[in-house]
Amino acid sequence: MDLYAVWGNPIVQSKSPLIQNKLATQTHQTIEYIAKLGDLDAFEQQLLAFFEEGAKGCNITSPFKERAYQLADEYSQRAKLAEACNTLKKLDDGKLYADNTDGIGLVTDLERLNWLRPNQRVLILGAGGATKGVLLPLLQAQQNIVLANRTFLKAKELAERFQPYGNIQAASMDSIPLQTYDVVINATSAGLSGGTAPVDAEILKLGSAFYDMQYTKGTDTPFIALCKSLGLTNISDGFGMLVAQAAHSFHLWRGVMPNFVAVYEQLK
């Protein structure tokens, strides 16, 4: 039986084994998919041993996406630009191929919500690792992006890296252009840490739809709670993105594209 896993630290909270096994059942693929706790000091040795023992592929979650990318021999364009991967596949020649399905997972979920049309204005809050993985697929979907970050320089550097691929501009959190936004995407992990919003409420009120790349089971994320408290509508957490990126990883490994919406509906 072909072996796959998700690697992270911590990992006990991961929904990936549940999701991937549902995708396998739906597509009549026989696989074993497990969760593996990565050692912060010995992750590289663990991962290489995992593949040497015959594993076919894996997902990578926090905090190992950049380190896993460094171990790969070949890369997709979206992994290369993100300098991080969430998916590794062992090729027939034994080489490791890195992909990043986070962004295409986000785009696929925005399509499910009917929130994705060409030439929209999208505001992304946060310029960290989560954002790096999603910018290329959003730009390829012809979205016009304002990338806002507390540290302007970080947003500026990221925007400049992706400018050859579409329309993207940087802003600091307190200088976001006052214009309407078709979608506001929260890519900050902090949410409302310390009770402070990632962005001024008046900016949020310029949005039409609100997407949090985070999700918490059974309760609202801080960003979603903030949106609701402002009376905003068209709000979604990132669980659909999680299922969709898993489906795209599965497709890379198995050559079969699952119906991610059916699995999302089962698990939500």
Swiss-Prot record:
One GO process term, biological-process aspect: aromatic amino acid family biosynthetic process
Catalytic activity: shikimate + NADP(+) = 3-dehydroshikimate + NADPH + H(+)
Keyword Lyase appears in the UniProt entry: no
Pfam families hit by this protein: SDH_C (PF18317), Shikimate_DH (PF01488), Shikimate_dh_N (PF08501)
Entry EC number(s): 1.1.1.25
Recorded family membership: Belongs to the shikimate dehydrogenase family.
Name of the protein in its database record: Shikimate dehydrogenase (NADP(+))
Species whose genome carries this gene: Haemophilus influenzae (strain PittGG)
Gene: aroE
